[in-house]
Amino acid sequence: MRSVFAALNCGDRERAIELAHPEIVLDATRNVFNPKTYVGKDGLRQWLTDTDDVWEGMHTEQDEFIDAGDRVVVIGRLVGKGKGSGVEVGQPNATVLTIRDGLLIRYETGYTNRREALEAVGLSEQDAHADS
């Protein structure tokens, strides 16, 4: 699912949407801004629009992808600038992706650290290191 992040980071939103299952659920309820759930490809488009309303140049840097069966834990950072404040942000972020039929069916964003995201998929730090 590296291709989803690559598409989003280079601004190719339609490619990212193509990689999503028609029934995708994007859970952004852990986020400070726009904390809600988005459903379907139209929901994904709305999330992208909502993100643009708050951030300039928002992108993610992925440091690690951890395989958890049909799920993937992505550890990295969110980088961008607040539209209203002009404050540059670079904060740790973890995301959990669920794959079905080779497509992204669930995108859970807003985990603030690695441990929290690993627990969401039933893994411990030890489990994650064993797979490395």
What are these regions (language model features)?
Residues 1-132:
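C-terminal and inter-domain tail/linker signature
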